[in-house]
């Protein structure tokens, strides 16, 4: 019984440590706009729904905004990730800084203005260039 509990404890500890070592991987949500962000900035392992013909990528952002925005370029610099998103028709790009605020909270900041839009009625309006994303468990 003691061995089983010890094994379980060690397994949980190693899982928690693994998550802490890869902070730029997971599913994140911005409650303010209803935007979902799915990222793995370490490896190209994700496929955007409806865009499987593009193959694996580092991530994408969808829901609460117009279309799907896919990561076309990224690099990590300590607790900050520099990301370039392109929209699903390839007409717009957006450079973003994603900074770790704490273990589960990330600050999204659009560089050079924001190209991401959402539909309001029959118009497309720009969303805020600053968003807060929280890790979804």
Stretch-by-stretch model annotation:
Residues 30, 48, 81-85, 105-110:
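Short hydrophobic/aromatic-rich beta-strand segments that constitute the beta-sheet cores
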Residues 35-76, 110-113:
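N-terminal glycine/threonine-rich, aromatic-flanked beta-hairpin/loop signature
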Residues 21, 64-80, 103, 109-137:
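Edge beta-strand at a domain terminus
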